[in-house]
Swiss-Prot record:
Segments crossing the lipid bilayer: 8-28, 41-61, 72-92, 110-130, 146-166
Protein name per its UniProtKB record: UPF0397 protein VS_II0189
Membrane topology field: Multi-pass membrane protein
Species the sequence originates in: Vibrio atlanticus (strain LGP32) (Vibrio splendidus (strain Mel32))
GO (cellular component) term, any one: plasma membrane
InterPro entries reported for this sequence: ECF_substrate-spec-like, UPF0397
Assigned protein family: Belongs to the UPF0397 family.
Localization per Swiss-Prot or TrEMBL: Cell membrane
Keyword tags: Cell membrane, Membrane, Transmembrane, Transmembrane helix
Length: 182
């Protein structure tokens, strides 16, 4: 798979923003080793704008960066989970026929965005929780509680912040499409 220079730069910027924004100092601790991160909105934005492959790589590399800088070691199971979240949310442009790029954001598209955010969090971090119980013998109740908190919290955060961002993107795209030469 060959990436254009633009795509590589987008992935690098997205991963850096998501990775640094995911550090504990920017999050809200809610449970054992569980933090709600506003950086999830960054992952959602890059996924929606650039698709599932970029979304996966921004989530995967960005979470890796978070774990490296946080100092608790890289948890590949949760790194993979963030990649899956980005990939699932990245399906948005294909499922909406790129209406956002045309300056449109009907409520059905926003509802789909929220459903993809929830599905991405449940599937992505559900995979992480499952792998933690298998590979690291983590207690099921602990990882299930982490999954429940993360999926609900991230979905709410992505929905609220994402709505504001998506409305702004749609407005900008609509204005740029309406420019005419005088």
């Amino acid at each position: 798979m060959n990436f254009s220079a633009k795509t590589v730069v987008v992935i690098a910027i997205g991963a850096a923003l998501y990775g640094i924004g995911g550090l504990p100092m920017f999050g809200v601790p809610v449970f054992a080793n569980t933090t709600l991160k506003p950086a999830m909105a960054v992952l959602a934005l890059f996924s929606v704008l650039f698709g599932p492959i970029v979304g996966f790589l921004v989530g995967f590399i960005g979470h890796w960066v978070t774990d490296l800088f946080a100092g608790w070691g890289v948890w590949l199971t949760w790194v993979l989970g963030s990649g899956i979240v980005g990939m699932v949310i990245g399906l948005f442009p294909m499922m909406t026929k790129n209406r956002l790029q045309q300056g449109e954001l009907p409520m059905k598209d926003f509802a789909l965005f929220v459903v993809l955010a929830l599905a991405g969090n449940v599937v992505g971090y559900g995979s992480s929780a499952f792998l933690d119980t298998i590979l690291y013998a983590e207690p099921f109740t602990k990882v299930f509680t982490q999954l429940s908190i993360i999926a609900a919290g991230n979905t709410i955060l992505i929905a609220v912040v994402g709505f504001l961002i998506l409305k702004s993107v749609a407005k900008r795209n609509k204005q740029s499409r309406n420019l005419t030469e005088a």
